[in-house]
């Protein structure tokens, strides 16, 4: 298995496809996700990836497995101490190969190098494998930190 990670802002079309698959998967689990994505200005995010995920404060990575786009992950600045992990997604046919772990390790390393003290994330209870993975890396549950309208959202933090 040949795995490589590339900076995703230059791979807009591939990122757009992965983000679309990710949001479709979420909406299949809970239709109210659509409203949440609108609140996040999702369409603008896709048009201007650099604004949210650009260097020096953010990151967006595209993971390839055997030369095929397999997944993605983003990191965005909240403030000088806090950043947020976003859009972790591994395509179904690539799951079970520890690729999500590979991406999380990359983002944690990058967050430390940038100088952040904590990584935050929000997730949903119908993603138990993701929650388990986050906990494996040391994320723990916290109080709400954003305006996510999903009543069931779970908020997590990793101390760097």
Labelled PLM ranges:
Residues 45-62:
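A short helix-loop-beta-strand connector motif used in the catalytic cores of GNAT acetyltransferases and
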Residues 77, 91-97, 125-126:
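Active-site acidic-Proline motif in GNAT/NAT acetyltransferases
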Residues 6, 20-49:
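Conserved GNAT-fold acetyl-CoA-binding loop/helix
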Residues 1-17, 21, 160:
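Conserved N-terminal entry element of GNAT/NAT acetyltransferase domains
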Residues 62, 68-76, 84:
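Conserved beta-strand in the GNAT
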């Amino acid at each position: 298995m040949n795995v490589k990670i590339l900076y995703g802002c230059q791979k807009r079309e591939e990122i757009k496809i992965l983000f679309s698959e990710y949001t479709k998967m979420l909406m299949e689990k809970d239709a109210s996700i659509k409203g949440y994505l609108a609140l996040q200005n999702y369409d603008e995010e896709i048009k201007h990836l650099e604004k949210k995920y650009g260097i020096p404060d953010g990151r967006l990575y595209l993971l390839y497995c055997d030369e095929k786009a397999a997944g993605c992950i983003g990191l965005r600045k909240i403030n000088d101490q806090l950043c947020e992990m976003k859009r972790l997604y591994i395509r179904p046919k690539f799951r079970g190969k520890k690729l999500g772990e590979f991406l999380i390790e990359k983002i944690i390393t990058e967050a430390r190098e940038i100088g952040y003290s904590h990584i935050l994330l929000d997730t949903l209870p119908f993603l138990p494998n993701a929650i388990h993975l986050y906990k494996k890396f040391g994320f723990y549950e916290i109080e709400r930190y954003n305006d996510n309208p999903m009543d069931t959202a779970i908020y997590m933090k990793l101390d760097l």
